Amino acid sequence: MRVKTFVILCCALQYVAYTNANINDFDEDYFGSDVTVQSSNTTDEIIRDASGAVIEEEITTKKMQRKNKNHGILGKNEKMIKTFVITTDSDGNESIVEEDVLMKTLSDGTVAQSYVAADAGAYSQSGPYVSNSGYSTHQGYRSDFASAAVGAGAGAGAAAGSGAGAGAGYGAASGAGA
C-alpha cells in the first residue's frame, strides 16, 4: 500500500513539474539565465464579452531586467520595444505574435524635414504613413494588434504609443510595464 501511494505521489509531482516547466519555457528559452525578475503581479478580472458570456481573466505581469544585451542594431538615440502576444488554446496550440518597435530620438530639424517630405507625398518613417491594413504608424497605435494585446493582457502600452510598454515582452494591459 505504501509503495502505491509513493508511486502516485511521484507521478503527481512529475506532472506538476512538467506543467510548470511548459509555462516557463518561453521565458527561459528566450531570455536565458542572465535575466532578473524585478517584479511579478497577478490580477483577476471577471468581464462580459459582446455575446454576453462571462469570462474570468487572470493576468500575470512580469517585469524582467537583462543587462548589456545589445543586438548590434541600435544606435545611440534608439530604443527597441519588443512585444509578444502568445495565445494558447486548451489543446496546447500556440499562436505567437511578435512586434518590434524601433524608437529613434530625432532633432526638431529632422522632424520638420520629415513632415515636409510626407506632405509632398514621399514615404517617411516618422511621418503620417498609413499601411495597407489602415492604421497610422505615426500615431503609434495599431488597432488590430492592440486589441489582441489587451485581450491577452500583454504589452498594449507599447502598441498604444505611450513609450511605457513592455520592455522585455511583458507588460500590463494598461501599458504600465517598463
UniProtKB/Swiss-Prot annotation:
Pfam family membership, one: Fib-H_N
Mod. after translation: The interchain disulfide bridge is essential for the intracellular transport and secretion of fibroin.
Tissue: Produced exclusively in the posterior (PSG) section of silk glands, which are essentially modified salivary glands.
Region of interest: Highly repetitive: 149-178
Gene3D superfamilies: 6.20.280.10
Signal sequence interval, chain numbering: 1-21
Keyword annotations from UniProtKB, A to Z: Disulfide bond, Repeat, Signal, Silk protein
Transmembrane region(s): none
Domain of life: Eukaryota
Comment block on domains: Composed of antiparallel beta sheets. The strands of the beta sheets run parallel to the fiber axis. Long stretches of silk fibroin are composed of microcrystalline arrays of (-Gly-Ser-Gly-Ala-Gly-Ala-)n interrupted by regions containing bulkier residues. The fiber is composed of microcrystalline arrays alternating with amorphous regions.
Complex and partners: Silk fibroin elementary unit consists in a disulfide-linked heavy and light chain and a p25 glycoprotein in molar ratios of 6:6:1. This results in a complex of approximately 2.3 MDa.
Function: Core component of the silk filament; a strong, insoluble and chemically inert fiber.
Protein's UniProt name: Fibroin heavy chain
Organism of this sequence: Bombyx mandarina
Name of the encoding gene: FIBH
